[in-house]
Amino acid sequence: MSPPPGTAPHPEPTALPFRRIALVLSGGGALGAYEVGVLKVVERIRLVPSLVSGVSIGAINAVAWLAAGRDVRPIEQVWLTARAESLGVQWVSLTLRVIGALTASLALLEVVLGLAGSRELSGAYWLWRKGSAHIDLVSTQLDLALWIVLALAGGLTALYARRVARDLDRRSQGVDPVGLRARLKRVALAATAVHLVVWVMGWPWPQRFSASVVLLLLLAWLASTPGHVGRWLRSLALGLMPETSGRGLWSGRARRRILERIVVQGDRRALAGPGTGLVVSALAIDTGLIGHFVSWPDPDPVFAEKLSHELGEVLPVPDANTMISAAVASSAIPGLFQPERVLGRDFVDAGGFSNQPLHVAIAHGADAMLVVLLTPSSSPALSSPPADVVSLGGRLLELANWRDLQTELRHLPASWTEAGPASRVCVVAPREPLPASLLSFDPGRAATLIALG
């Protein structure tokens, strides 16, 4: 197969005492620029792996590298110009959408409260012209007093949150959801009736506070119902989330565009079809299994059975577009990016469960492998306790990757661990944590990470 115009020709394989060398690229978000540096070395020594397996950002790099004819230059150019916004991490867009949604919601709430909580619009005022400044003053004072009481109650709840949580947990034991919904309905209707009577009569009353409580009770009850209105309200609340209808903060469109641009300029045939060797792993939401998307048709049943024992499933892709979707799904960090639909099913990033799937390469028949990690592979010593949530999250990711690697290494075939003329597993990993975080996409940091790789 001749390389496409504009790409470097395939180098001759390096002479090594192995027949089938696998390249495993792990996940780690913006740290994935480190893998580009490793791929530059792989290209320089003319190493041509028979299998490339990628997870999360490793899947993105794997698909882009193979589609570019194993030429690192297009991928390096993407990394050296990539920022969080260009990869779909749209913090400004998210902020504007949230502000817009909150502004619209509060404005509509004020309209409702202006109609339902105003004595000037009550039946008593318009039908009987009954009322006085004294009634207005009393209503305003009652409103203010009740809002102050509510603020104090909220502050005390936050102050004694543990005690309140224990009390709620004790009271909620054995609660019937259907009965609770029925009681909520009765309370909401009773509060509505009281508010309407007072509103029509024009009596001194905390009008806006009362209208707020009634509105919240009615919305809570309607949202808890199983019917069409309840489903609509729940979907409306989820719809306030940007781009993804509540299944994540951002979509995968930006990552898809980057891969499609590289594939269009490269060779689509490298991503799907006979003679290819690409595996992209993602977590299936419906079954909880790790879906291993393979680029070749009719995978070996023995290969599929071995992965089934590791709670995985083999999913052959019919074309390059499906493999691109698989890579987008593999890099869809749960909670941040929405799940990606591939072959009619939803998948997300599998890095938290299997970040360096060595067993996939072994099951495929590899007799040696090059494993690229984005965190130190040695026992992760802790210099100081994590100072905040972000550093704690980074520490937990480091530990999860380290534990996953140790588990994979302990399941290597016995012949791989015996002394021999050459090591069968080469682990490439930074000696210290890399100077970047999961979402810190930046050209300067990327250049540093590529140099370290």
Label every model-predicted segment.
Residues V263-V279:
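A short alpha-helix-loop-beta-strand transition element characteristic
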Residues T448-L452:
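A non-catalytic, amphipathic alpha-helix used as a structural packing/dimerization or gating element
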Residues V428-D442:
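Short helix/strand-capping connector loops at secondary-structure junctions
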Residues P4, L16, R20-A22, G29-R253, ...:
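Patatin-like phospholipase
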Residues G6-A8, E35, R255, F353-P357:
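Amphipathic coiled-coil/heptad-repeat helices and related helical stalk/stem segments
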